[in-house]
UniProtKB/Swiss-Prot annotation:
A divalent metal cation 3 binds at C15, C19, C24, C29. A divalent metal cation 5 binds at C34, C36, C37, C50. A divalent metal cation 2 binds at C7, C13, C15, C26. The lineage of its organism: Eukaryota, Metazoa, Chordata, Craniata, Vertebrata. The keyword Ribonucleoprotein does not apply. GO terms for molecular function: zinc ion binding. Residues 1-29 are annotated as: Beta. This is Metallothionein-1. It comes from the Eukaryota. Metallothioneins have a high content of cysteine residues that bind various heavy metals; these proteins are transcriptionally regulated by both heavy metals and glucocorticoids. The keyword Acetylation applies. PANTHER family: METALLOTHIONEIN, METALLOTHIONEIN-1G.
């Protein structure tokens, strides 16, 4: 379980707007699930890998 999310890691779920989970594929999270992913990225919920804090993730490049 992600301490910042009320669901199992890697499982589609609904999270609050304050969701900070990175591994959880939050379907309702309005923020990017990756710090390097732009807000609103449609592919971020499919899971992405961030190479660095300032780099784009591989699914939103």
């Amino acid at each position: 379980m992600d301490p910042n999310c009320s669901c199992a890691t890697g499982v589609s779920c609904t999270c609050a707007d304050s969701c900070k989970c990175k591994e959880c594929k939050c379907t309702s999270c309005k923020k990017s699930c990756c710090s390097c992913c732009p807000v609103g990225c449609a592919k971020c919920a499919q899971g992405c890998v961030c190479k660095g804090a300032s780099e784009k993730c591989n699914c939103c490049a």
